[in-house]
C-alpha cells in the first residue's frame, strides 16, 4: 500500500513538473494519430518553407557503389514510402547518377507510384538534375555542360520534365560560367548555393542581400541574369532540428517526463525569426536534410509532421512542406 502511495505521489510530482514546464492543454493533439500538415501561405506571417532533401555526393568518404548500397537505395525506398503516407509531404532529390541507378532497379508498380509523385511535384526532380553536383573551379566548361545535359535528358525521357532550379550547395565558390551558361543558359529560374567567401557572406547578412539578381556576364547583361540565393549557415538544418540524429526527436507524449512541445516550438520560431531578420520579404526556406540523410525517412517526416502541426498552432509563424520551385515563385511574386 505504501509503495502505491509513493508511486501515486511520484506520478503527481512528475505531472506537476511537466505541467509547469509546458502545459499540454495549450496544444491540440493529432486527430486519430494524424498531424495537421496542410500547407498554405499566410500573407500576414513569416512563411517558412521546409525543403526536405538529401545531399548525396557520388563519391566522398566512400565509393559510388558503397554509398548506393549502404545509403542511397534506402533513402529513395523510404522517401517514396513516406510520401505515399501523407499527401502534404515533399522530398527533393538531385543527383541523377544515383537516382537513375535506383530507377532502373524498380518494378512497374513502384515506377507508377514514382511517376505520379513526380507529376504532383511531391518528389521533386526539377532541381539541378545533373549526373552530379559538379565543382565550379577545376572542370572544363564542356564537361560541366555534358554531365548536366546527360542528367536532364534522362529526366525528359523518363518523366517529361526539365529542371528549373540550380542547386550548387557544396562546391566551394561559384563561377561566372555556372551563373551564365549553366543557370540562366539552361533555363533555370533560380540558383541556390551555400559556400561563398565569409566576408561576402557577412556583408550580405548585414544588408539583407543573401538573395539577389546575379548578372555573371557583363557582355550579355540582363540576358544572363538569374535570381540567386545564398543559404543561411549551411544546407543542413539548424541545431536540434536535424532529425536524422538520435536524440533530436520531438517528444509530444504529455505522460512522459521529457515532454517539451513548448520548448521545441519556441526554439524553432526563434531560429526562423532570426533568419527572417536577415532576409527580405515574408518567405524563407529552411533545408531539412544533410549528407546522405533520409535512409530512415520515417524519422525525418514524422518529426517534421509534428513540427508543422505544433508551430502553426503557436501563431507566430506559418510553416509548410514546400519545394524550391514554389518558394522561388513566392519570392519572385514579392518583387
Model-identified regions with their sequence ranges:
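Catalytic-domain carbohydrate-binding cleft regions of carbohydrate-active enzymes
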Residues: 19-335
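Cleavable N-terminal signal peptides of Sec/SRP-targeted secreted and luminal proteins
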Residues: 2-20
Amino acid at each position: 500500500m505504501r509503495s502505491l502511495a509513493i508511486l501515486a505521489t511520484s506520478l503527481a510530482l512528475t505531472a506537476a513538473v511537466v505541467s509547469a514546464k509546458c502545459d499540454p492543454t495549450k496544444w491540440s493533439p493529432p486527430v486519430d494519430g494524424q498531424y495537421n500538415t496542410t500547407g498554405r501561405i499566410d500573407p500576414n506571417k513569416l512563411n517558412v518553407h521546409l525543403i526536405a532533401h538529401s545531399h548525396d555526393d557520388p563519391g566522398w568518404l566512400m565509393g559510388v557503389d558503397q554509398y548506393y548500397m549502404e545509403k542511397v537505395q534506402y533513402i529513395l525506398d523510404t522517401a517514396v514510402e513516406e510520401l505515399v503516407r501523407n499527401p502534404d509531404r515533399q522530398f527533393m532529390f538531385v543527383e541523377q547518377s544515383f537516382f537513375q541507378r535506383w530507377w532502373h532497379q524498380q518494378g512497374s508498380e513502384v515506377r507508377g507510384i514514382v511517376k505520379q509523385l513526380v507529376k504532383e511535384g511531391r518528389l521533386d526532380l526539377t532541381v539541378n538534375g545533373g549526373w552530379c553536383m559538379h565543382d565550379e573551379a577545376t572542370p572544363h566548361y564542356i564537361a560541366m555542360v555534358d554531365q548536366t545535359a546527360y542528367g536532364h535528358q534522362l529526366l525528359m525521357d523518363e518523366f517529361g520534365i526539365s529542371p528549373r532550379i540550380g542547386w550548387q550547395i557544396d562546391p566551394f565558390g561559384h563561377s561566372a560560367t555556372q551563373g551564365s551558361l549553366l543557370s540562366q543558359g539552361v533555363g533555370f529560374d533560380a540558383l541556390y548555393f551555400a559556400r561563398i567567401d565569409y566576408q561576402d557572406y557577412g556583408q550580405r547578412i548585414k544588408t539583407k542581400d543573401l538573395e539577389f539578381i546575379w548578372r555573371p556576364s557583363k557582355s550579355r547583361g540582363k540576358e544572363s541574369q538569374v535570381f540567386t540565393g545564398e543559404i543561411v549557415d549551411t544546407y543542413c538544418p539548424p541545431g536540434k532540428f536535424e532529425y536524422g540524429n538520435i536524440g533530436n526527436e520531438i517528444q509530444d507524449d504529455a505522460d512522459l517526463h521529457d515532454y517539451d512541445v513548448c520548448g521545441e516550438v519556441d526554439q524553432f520560431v526563434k531560429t526562423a525569426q532570426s533568419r527572417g531578420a536577415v532576409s527580405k520579404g515574408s518567405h524563407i526556406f529552411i533545408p531539412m536534410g544533410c549528407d546522405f540523410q533520409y535512409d530512415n525517412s520515417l524519422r525525418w517526416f514524422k518529426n517534421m509532421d509534428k513540427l508543422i502541426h505544433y508551430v502553426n498552432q503557436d501563431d507566430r509563424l506559418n510553416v509548410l512542406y514546400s519545394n524550391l520551385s514554389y518558394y522561388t515563385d513566392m519570392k519572385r511574386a514579392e518583387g
